[in-house]
Amino acid sequence: GIPLFKGKNVQNGKLVLSFESYIPESVSDELPRSQITKKCLLTPYVGTIGNIAVFDGSFKAHLGSNVGKIELLNSDTQTFILEEYVLWYLKSTYGYAELTKYKKATAQESISIDAIRNVVIAIPPLEEQRRIVAKLEEILPLCERLK
């Protein structure tokens, strides 16, 4: 079967690839909007708001309920925005505030897909995005060890 991403599969900026649920290939073919077949960001929109991770597109999967995908507007031949940059941006204080300013506090926090679409993200030139991602990936593991 085709694995189904649930909110618990997106934790602390990483994907947990142990799946509890799968759907048959025939059902998958009937649900193209929830298919994930290329690199994108995944985020729960109920419960753990702001918990985002990059899906590398290395296998076919599906979105479970309460998990959304963020596909960036890159062309097939040219990259303008790095998924890893958007991940780090949305995990930053400013990016998290931008993402969560639309959340609804009920029994479980939630954010609508339309609200996610309206999040403003500062996008520097591609080379600057690469430098930012590389520096964060170099420094943050050291910071984690110091905790």
Language model features: what each stretch is:
Residues 77-84:
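Short, conserved charged micro-motifs
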Residues 96-98, 102, 114-147:
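Amphipathic alpha-helical coiled-coil/heptad-repeat segments
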Residues 8-38, 58:
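Sequence-specific dsDNA recognition surfaces
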Residues 49-56:
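Short, Lys/Arg- and Gly-enriched loop/turn segments at beta-strand edges
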